[in-house]
Amino acid sequence: MGKKRIVLLLFISFSYAEITKESPLSIGQTLSSSNGVYELGFFSFNNSQNQYVGIWFKGIIPRVVVWVANREKPVTDSAANLVISSSGSLLLINGKHDVVWSTGEISASKGSHAELSDYGNLMVKDNVTGRTLWESFEHLGNTLLPLSTMMYNLVTGEKRGLSSWKSYTDPSPGDFWVQITPQVPSQGFVMRGSTPYYRTGPWAKTRYTGIPQMDESYTSPFSLHQDVNGSGYFSYFERDYKLSRIMLTSEGSMKVLRYNGLDWKSSYEGPANSCDIYGVCGPFGFCVISDPPKCKCFKGFVPKSIEEWKRGNWTSGCARRTELHCQGNSTGKDANVFHTVPNIKPPDFYEYANSVDAEGCYQSCLHNCSCLAFAYIPGIGCLMWSKDLMDTMQFSAGGEILSIRLAHSELDVHKRKMTIVASTVSLTLFVILGFATFGFWRNRVKHHDAWRNDLQSQDVPGLEFFEMNTIQTATSNFSLSNKLGHGGFGSVYKGKLQDGREIAVKRLSSSSEQGKQEFMNEIVLISKLQHRNLVRVLGCCVEGKEKLLIYEFMKNKSLDTFVFGSRKRLELDWPKRFDIIQGIVRGLLYLHRDSRLRVIHRDLKVSNILLDEKMNPKISDFGLARLFQGSQYQDKTRRVVGTLGYMSPEYAWTGVFSEKSDIYSFGVLLLEIISGEKISRFSYGEEGKALLAYVWECWCETRGVNLLDQALDDSSHPAEVGRCVQIGLLCVQHQPADRPNTLELLSMLTTTSDLPLPKQPTFAVHTRNDEPPSNDLMITVNEMTESVILGR
């Protein structure tokens, strides 16, 4: 009987309903909410000695911590306790009885107790009156739970928002914080220090106007209330999801996360792409996700710095082409006009005009010379702008209508342009009809030339068609001295056109059926993609059995000649390698999120990175690339194509590919750039460890510093190298969900915020056999178990 009693007492001691003066909370004990959803207790990261007091979702693995008491000061001894003081305050004390954290001074004459509510709110309550004396919902961390609030009070100066963790394993305040603004209507900001990083746009009753999926039909879980006394409160409540949270990540991303019983799914993330980054296009510029180039000037404005815009730096913005001469009621040539732009995220620095309808909004702006633009928005009313139009985006659908004041002469410019355009179109149609007639006759005569028909049926604007004799002359009839390389597609030659342009000519192998598909794919894709970190296609040539693709020539050829070359590797010091790494990621970000086409490359590797005369990287070879439509995030194929070693586990074995499979390939590429070793040929030790296994070993021993190419010792930056090794390992994680997305990847490379710890990559446990290395891979998934995978 005695033994049974001891067991019962031990069980009860691990589970508390409340913390009292007589019943403190020790390490190993927890406090649970009455509904069993939330739990409070001591925890540590990666079994370290640093102990924190926090709240998490009970029973969900891995543990998701939503609030930390002592986020800046962990305790390091096992005798720490969470106690109620004689005055009623909640204290965290260490083994020496030093106060590590407290709720602050609380007055409870008859004592107090602490309990955890069903909504995850830790509350200290008066024992007699039951009044709440202190609550964690008024001291937010990086997470907003349902019914908790962000707020401001202009009278008291109080502000309450979210602050990011330094890293996934360090809850101390990081670089980012979230606030709602006191302006009317309010908007949400993610700040990086004192600099805006992301903006939601103004609030319109149930939605933020800068988030396109929150249209007027959106069923909103959010609530924002502003009163006449200068206070504002933002909160949310999910009726359809028992477990949900809004989280600010250490990289500055706001995520709305919902638990589906198996995993946390993000229903919204901001910033979602580089257009979402605050002010990316500068004053009077706007960002267009679906139409490269990414930034444009509003009608009537031109880039302030053409050279900067050509380099892809748009932050200087745009300047007015014709100055305004505003005199209120003036007419004729002196009058101003308004140009409307649809699907717009309302710019920052707006002013609210109360009790004005749509016509009144227009009239108010028209007769106010300082008014540069206006918008009448359902759920808000009239907004006007008298300062720079900053942080503006144009969505493919949704958004608001913005009316911008222009000089009357801008309309005259438009009319003159329309006249010129009309004449040009007429002439062009005549020329096109002539060529079409000739082309029809030529194709009837040369009916076997089906390739040209295929090309003419594709939407390939701006593509130049070269004659075969032109290319033969440029390449000295494809002489061996001009040959740059050879691959599964065919051979690549250097050439020089009569106008002096240097070109690279990819000559399709006539025996390659796969090459035909690659050829068509590459023409259609690359002609529509324009970015400084993507190779540019100039045109093509199709004549008889010859199929040629003509590119801009890259003076320094491909990256592999520098990374793996015994002599040239010395020319690539660490700073230059790091610049190349960042350039590749920017090109990937454009493919995955910023171009009007969402493209998965599927064959990212060192040899497919070309270098121009300034050693700027250009992603090339889009023959295997796939397009994603709308909200599509992954696809599956029965025909797996790619390069062995660079393919992610889920793609190699099941045919599933996504943004995360390109991230895996980049991780391998990154580790090759750092180490100077090729994944298909590397073998280490008696066991013949593969490259990823060796990288993991280096990471465990020295955090990857000893992985660096020995030729770079004098030029290296150990901390930067170690960080890149860690990022590379995060990219080659077995589960796609454990890999960063492309936007997070760029943030990891360009900030110093702490990173999550990588797990051992699955492919890192394998060793190499004695077979020769394979290069390009092309197999069918349902035949995989019976196939021997060899290179082409």
Curated annotation (Swiss-Prot):
Gene Ontology terms for molecular function: ATP binding; calmodulin binding; carbohydrate binding; protein serine kinase activity; protein serine/threonine kinase activity; ubiquitin protein ligase binding
Membrane topology: Single-pass type I membrane protein
Residues modified as Phosphothreonine: T637
InterPro entries, sorted: Bulb-type_lectin_dom, Bulb-type_lectin_dom_sf, Kinase-like_dom_sf, Pan_app, Prot_kinase_dom, Protein_kinase_ATP_BS, S-locus_recpt_kinase_C, S_locus_glycoprot_dom
Residues modified by glycosylation: N46, N127, N229, N313, N329, N368
All ranges on the Extracellular side of the membrane: 18-419
Keywords, comma-separated and alphabetical: ATP-binding, Cell membrane, Disulfide bond, EGF-like domain, Glycoprotein, Kinase, Lectin, Membrane, Nucleotide-binding, Phosphoprotein, Receptor, Serine/threonine-protein kinase, Signal, Transferase, Transmembrane, Transmembrane helix
Active site residues of this protein: D603
Catalysed reactions, semicolon-separated: L-seryl-[protein] + ATP = O-phospho-L-seryl-[protein] + ADP + H(+); L-threonyl-[protein] + ATP = O-phospho-L-threonyl-[protein] + ADP + H(+)
Residues with the Phosphoserine modification: S512, S527, S607, S620, S680, S774
Disulphide-bridged cysteine pairs: C275-C287, C281-C295, C361-C382, C365-C371
Chain sites annotated for binding ATP: L484, G485, H486, G487, G488, F489, G490, S491, V492, K506
Chain intervals for the UniProt region annotation (CaM-binding): 567-584
Transmembrane segments annotated in the record for this chain: 420-440
Superkingdom as given in the UniProt entry: Eukaryota
Gene Ontology CC: plasma membrane
Gene Ontology annotations of biological process type: recognition of pollen
Domain Protein kinase: 478-763
Residues covered by the PAN domain: 326-408
PANTHER family cross-referenced by the UniProt entry: ATP BINDING _ PROTEIN KINASE, RECEPTOR-LIKE SERINE/THREONINE-PROTEIN KINASE SD1-8
Protein family (similarity comment): Belongs to the protein kinase superfamily. Ser/Thr protein kinase family.
Protein name: G-type lectin S-receptor-like serine/threonine-protein kinase At1g61440
Organism, scientific name: Arabidopsis thaliana (Mouse-ear cress)
Taxon lineage: Eukaryota, Viridiplantae, Streptophyta, Embryophyta, Tracheophyta
